[in-house]
């Protein structure tokens, strides 16, 4: 499991320990005084930290594992991602009947909804998640451990359930959402060249 936290406020400055390169730790973040806390929840609200654990399977389910969004725009205060295949990923709770799940994703189809997170899969109606896959439909293999899956794939040469390229695309999409939020305007993105075409500010 995991959690998403709001960033903590920095406390009063303290001397930086000799074994810590504080400038390197801050990276591109604004310069701030060291306050004794280098915890993982200092700068984010979970989108890059916890969000990509959910966004990788959103991209997989929408057939976008090896690409990225082409448009980003805000609606109802949340960033939304539009893909070339016509799918739009809405960065907010889907209105309507609750389907369960805790901070994951809700897939909306013509016959129902399926909510999935790290611990559960819930559907409305319940029968939507019980329909068996037919021959020829994609069957994802199960893995209970990323590290165990990686070691198994080293031995078998099978592709990991979430390899570096997939992780890159999931993290990139969320980074793009951060740029869209900072600029406060819609953006176009070229997922092949990985650039904002004709938009130097972005």
PLM-predicted stretches and their roles:
Residues 1-202:
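Contiguous beta-strand/loop segments that form the cofactor/metal-binding neighborhood of enzyme cores
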